[in-house]
């Protein structure tokens, strides 16, 4: 407790507890003791997606699609609930520990609700996943956090396949300007796949439509849900899953929980 309890912690509590979904880590309760504010969440036994991908040196296209299908369903639900996550990444995506793992999104500390919180206008998130409009935002300007979430999903898909970030380069490691170089590549959407990987034309088409600098021209989630690559081997009922999700009866409560 104290100065570390910021507006981000409050947003995390208010937004996360509304998101009850199979692909989102369940928010169970929050309580305060003498020195700490404690958030109790569902346990995900399989660790996070970053470690999972790194251990395998990247995933086969079919396995990456399995995870990406779940990611998009989770993100679509979050957006339906009026929330932009603003920090979607492998490190914030947990696994349930089953033989064919299911993903669980977590960490809503940078999230914003479109009705109850101001429009996104700050450069928050993890640099490697930032959308161009987030990088370019200036004081007094805003951007659509839901649209920038889609960019982050595209970066996640690339990392799942390759095992490294799309806008980083091996030669940057010893360069003191490596962060700035990466940011410039993001703004130019300058990425490619290693020659060792054989990426299907459908996958390349989808990524080319997600990783678009102009947010107005970026593919939408409904369009992703209809894309041929996304729909391949899609389990029955997945597209309709979010129609059956029940919104918590408590609604969005903004009482002082800190």
Model-based region annotation:
Residues 73-83:
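Protein kinase catalytic-loop region centered on the HRD/HxD motif
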Residues 29-30:
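A short, aromatic-enriched beta-strand patch in the conserved N-lobe beta-sheet
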Residues 212-237:
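Terminal C-lobe "cap" of eukaryotic-type protein kinase domains
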Residues 34-48, 52:
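Conserved short submotifs of the Hanks-type protein kinase catalytic core
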Residues 1-19:
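Conserved N-lobe beta3->alphaC-helix segment of eukaryotic protein kinase catalytic domains
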Residues 67-68:
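Activation segment signature within eukaryotic-like protein kinase domains
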């Amino acid at each position: 407790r104290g100065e570390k309890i910021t507006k981000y912690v409050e947003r995390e509590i208010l937004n996360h507890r509304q998101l009850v979904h199979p692909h989102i880590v369940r928010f169970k309760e929050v309580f305060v003791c003498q020195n700490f504010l404690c958030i109790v969440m569902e346990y995900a036994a399989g660790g996070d997606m970053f470690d999972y991908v790194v251990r395998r040196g990247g995933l086969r296209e079919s396995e990456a699609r399995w995870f990406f299908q779940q990611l998009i369903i989770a993100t679509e639900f979050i957006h339906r609930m009026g929330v932009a996550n603003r920090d979607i990444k492998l490190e914030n995506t947990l696994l349930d520990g089953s033989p064919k793992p299911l993903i669980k999104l977590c960490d809503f500390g940078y999230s914003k609700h479109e009705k109850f919180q101001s429009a996104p206008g700050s450069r928050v998130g993890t640099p490697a996943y930032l959308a161009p409009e987030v990088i370019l935002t200036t004081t007094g300007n805003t951007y659509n956090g839901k649209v920038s979430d889609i960019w982050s999903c595209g970066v996640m898909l690339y990392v799942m396949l390759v095992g490294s970030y799309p806008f980083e380069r091996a030669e940057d490691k010893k360069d003191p300007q490596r962060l700035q170089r990466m940011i410039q590549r993001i703004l130019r959407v300058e990425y490619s796949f290693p020659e060792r990987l054989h990426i299907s034309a459908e996958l390349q088409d989808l990524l080319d439509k997600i990783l678009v600098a102009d947010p107005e021209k970026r593919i939408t989630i409904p369009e992703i849900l209809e894309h041929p690559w996304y729909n391949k081997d899609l389990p029955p009922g997945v597209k309709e899953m979010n129609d059956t999700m029940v919104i918590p009866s408590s609604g969005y409560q903004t009482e002082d929980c800190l």
